[in-house]
Regions:
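Catalytic Walker B motif of ABC-type/P-loop ATPase nucleotide-binding domains
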Residues: 73-76
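Topological signature of polytopic alpha-helical transporters
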Residues: 11, 16, 20-31, 45, ...
Length: 185
Protein backbone atom coordinates (compact mmCIF):
# COMPACT_ATOMS: atom_id res chain seq x y z
CA UNK A 1 0.00 0.00 0.00
CA UNK A 2 1.37 3.37 -1.04
CA UNK A 3 1.62 6.22 1.44
CA UNK A 4 0.15 9.67 1.13
CA UNK A 5 2.03 12.94 0.77
CA UNK A 6 1.35 13.68 4.44
CA UNK A 7 2.62 10.27 5.59
CA UNK A 8 5.82 10.56 3.53
CA UNK A 9 6.55 13.95 5.03
CA UNK A 10 5.70 12.77 8.54
CA UNK A 11 8.00 9.76 8.14
CA UNK A 12 10.86 11.97 6.91
CA UNK A 13 10.45 14.19 9.98
CA UNK A 14 10.31 11.20 12.31
CA UNK A 15 13.22 9.27 10.79
CA UNK A 16 15.60 12.01 9.69
CA UNK A 17 14.52 15.16 11.47
CA UNK A 18 15.85 16.55 14.72
CA UNK A 19 14.98 14.61 17.88
CA UNK A 20 12.34 17.12 18.95
CA UNK A 21 10.32 16.21 15.82
CA UNK A 22 10.96 12.49 16.17
CA UNK A 23 9.97 12.45 19.85
CA UNK A 24 7.02 14.85 19.85
CA UNK A 25 4.04 13.81 17.67
CA UNK A 26 2.23 17.13 18.21
CA UNK A 27 5.23 19.21 17.19
CA UNK A 28 5.84 16.88 14.24
CA UNK A 29 2.24 17.30 13.04
CA UNK A 30 2.53 21.08 13.35
CA UNK A 31 5.81 21.04 11.40
CA UNK A 32 4.40 18.77 8.67
CA UNK A 33 1.42 21.06 8.19
CA UNK A 34 3.69 24.11 8.11
CA UNK A 35 5.97 22.57 5.47
CA UNK A 36 2.98 21.42 3.40
CA UNK A 37 1.76 25.01 3.40
CA UNK A 38 5.19 26.46 2.61
CA UNK A 39 5.62 24.13 -0.37
CA UNK A 40 2.00 24.61 -1.48
CA UNK A 41 1.18 20.93 -1.04
CA UNK A 42 -1.76 21.30 1.36
CA UNK A 43 -4.31 20.47 -1.33
CA UNK A 44 -2.63 17.12 -2.06
CA UNK A 45 -1.65 16.06 1.47
CA UNK A 46 -4.07 13.10 1.38
CA UNK A 47 -3.11 12.06 -2.15
CA UNK A 48 -1.02 9.05 -3.03
CA UNK A 49 2.43 10.07 -4.24
CA UNK A 50 1.98 8.25 -7.56
CA UNK A 51 -0.91 10.56 -8.43
CA UNK A 52 1.18 13.74 -8.16
CA UNK A 53 2.40 15.75 -11.13
CA UNK A 54 6.13 16.00 -11.81
CA UNK A 55 6.26 19.41 -10.17
CA UNK A 56 4.36 18.23 -7.11
CA UNK A 57 6.71 15.25 -6.76
CA UNK A 58 9.69 17.59 -6.98
CA UNK A 59 8.16 19.83 -4.30
CA UNK A 60 7.52 16.80 -2.08
CA UNK A 61 11.16 15.78 -2.45
CA UNK A 62 12.20 19.29 -1.42
CA UNK A 63 9.72 19.21 1.49
CA UNK A 64 11.08 15.87 2.71
CA UNK A 65 14.59 17.28 2.86
CA UNK A 66 13.50 20.67 4.21
CA UNK A 67 11.56 19.18 7.13
CA UNK A 68 14.77 17.63 8.47
CA UNK A 69 16.01 21.20 9.08
CA UNK A 70 19.36 20.92 7.32
CA UNK A 71 21.76 23.84 7.06
CA UNK A 72 22.60 22.79 3.49
CA UNK A 73 20.13 21.38 0.98
CA UNK A 74 21.52 19.47 -1.99
CA UNK A 75 19.40 19.51 -5.13
CA UNK A 76 20.32 17.45 -8.17
CA UNK A 77 18.73 18.96 -11.30
CA UNK A 78 15.79 20.56 -9.43
CA UNK A 79 14.21 21.64 -12.71
CA UNK A 80 14.24 18.19 -14.36
CA UNK A 81 10.94 16.41 -14.82
CA UNK A 82 9.04 19.62 -14.11
CA UNK A 83 6.88 21.24 -16.77
CA UNK A 84 7.49 24.87 -17.72
CA UNK A 85 4.63 26.31 -15.70
CA UNK A 86 5.76 24.56 -12.52
CA UNK A 87 9.52 25.25 -12.86
CA UNK A 88 9.14 28.86 -11.75
CA UNK A 89 7.02 27.84 -8.76
CA UNK A 90 9.57 25.24 -7.63
CA UNK A 91 12.45 27.67 -8.15
CA UNK A 92 10.68 30.45 -6.26
CA UNK A 93 10.24 28.07 -3.33
CA UNK A 94 13.95 27.21 -3.41
CA UNK A 95 14.85 30.92 -3.48
CA UNK A 96 12.61 31.50 -0.44
CA UNK A 97 14.43 28.70 1.38
CA UNK A 98 17.81 30.30 0.63
CA UNK A 99 16.45 33.65 1.78
CA UNK A 100 15.84 31.99 5.18
CA UNK A 101 19.58 31.55 5.47
CA UNK A 102 19.81 27.97 4.23
CA UNK A 103 22.58 27.05 1.81
CA UNK A 104 21.31 25.50 -1.40
CA UNK A 105 23.78 23.46 -3.43
CA UNK A 106 22.35 22.86 -6.91
CA UNK A 107 23.79 20.45 -9.44
CA UNK A 108 22.58 21.39 -12.91
CA UNK A 109 23.53 21.27 -16.56
CA UNK A 110 21.02 24.01 -17.42
CA UNK A 111 22.02 26.78 -15.00
CA UNK A 112 20.58 29.67 -17.00
CA UNK A 113 17.05 28.35 -16.40
CA UNK A 114 17.51 28.85 -12.67
CA UNK A 115 20.15 31.59 -12.58
CA UNK A 116 18.08 33.79 -10.24
CA UNK A 117 18.64 31.19 -7.50
CA UNK A 118 22.36 31.74 -7.40
CA UNK A 119 24.23 34.21 -5.25
CA UNK A 120 27.45 32.39 -6.10
CA UNK A 121 28.37 29.56 -8.41
CA UNK A 122 30.84 26.72 -8.13
CA UNK A 123 32.16 25.33 -11.39
CA UNK A 124 33.58 21.81 -11.30
CA UNK A 125 35.19 20.27 -14.36
CA UNK A 126 36.76 16.92 -15.16
CA UNK A 127 40.53 17.38 -15.19
CA UNK A 128 43.19 15.46 -17.11
CA UNK A 129 43.47 13.29 -13.99
CA UNK A 130 39.91 12.14 -14.70
CA UNK A 131 38.40 13.59 -11.55
CA UNK A 132 36.18 16.53 -10.73
CA UNK A 133 38.21 19.62 -9.84
CA UNK A 134 37.13 23.04 -8.66
CA UNK A 135 37.59 25.54 -11.49
CA UNK A 136 35.79 28.52 -10.00
CA UNK A 137 33.80 29.73 -7.02
CA UNK A 138 32.36 33.22 -6.84
CA UNK A 139 29.76 35.54 -8.30
CA UNK A 140 27.86 34.73 -11.49
CA UNK A 141 28.99 37.95 -13.18
CA UNK A 142 32.64 37.26 -12.43
CA UNK A 143 32.28 33.66 -13.65
CA UNK A 144 31.07 34.95 -17.00
CA UNK A 145 34.15 37.20 -17.20
CA UNK A 146 36.62 34.50 -16.13
CA UNK A 147 35.29 31.99 -18.65
CA UNK A 148 34.73 34.68 -21.33
CA UNK A 149 31.16 33.42 -21.65
CA UNK A 150 27.80 35.00 -22.39
CA UNK A 151 25.86 32.46 -20.29
CA UNK A 152 26.36 29.90 -17.56
CA UNK A 153 25.45 27.15 -20.02
CA UNK A 154 28.31 28.28 -22.24
CA UNK A 155 30.62 27.69 -19.27
CA UNK A 156 29.17 24.18 -18.82
CA UNK A 157 29.81 23.50 -22.51
CA UNK A 158 33.39 24.80 -22.30
CA UNK A 159 34.37 22.48 -19.47
CA UNK A 160 32.37 19.38 -20.44
CA UNK A 161 33.84 16.37 -22.16
CA UNK A 162 37.19 14.63 -22.06
CA UNK A 163 38.46 16.75 -24.94
CA UNK A 164 38.32 19.80 -22.66
CA UNK A 165 40.38 18.33 -19.80
CA UNK A 166 43.43 20.47 -20.63
CA UNK A 167 41.27 23.61 -20.51
CA UNK A 168 39.82 22.47 -17.18
CA UNK A 169 43.38 22.04 -15.88
CA UNK A 170 44.09 25.66 -16.85
CA UNK A 171 41.01 26.92 -15.01
CA UNK A 172 41.89 24.81 -11.96
CA UNK A 173 45.39 26.29 -11.91
CA UNK A 174 43.98 29.82 -12.37
CA UNK A 175 41.52 29.32 -9.52
CA UNK A 176 44.15 27.91 -7.17
CA UNK A 177 46.42 30.89 -7.92
CA UNK A 178 43.57 33.36 -7.41
CA UNK A 179 42.57 31.71 -4.16
CA UNK A 180 46.07 31.97 -2.79
CA UNK A 181 46.14 35.63 -3.78
CA UNK A 182 42.60 36.29 -2.52
CA UNK A 183 41.25 37.60 -5.83
CA UNK A 184 38.78 34.93 -7.04
CA UNK A 185 35.04 35.57 -6.89
Amino acid sequence: MEDTVYKNLEDAAKLYGPSELADNPELRKEEVLSVLKKLDLESVKGSKCSSLSGGQKKKLTIAMEYITRPEILFMDEPDSGVDGSMVMEVMTTLREITDEGKILCVITHTPDRIRHLFDKVMVVGKSSEGCGRLCYFGSVDNALKVFAAQSLEEIVHKISGAENAALVDQYVQWFENERRGGHAG
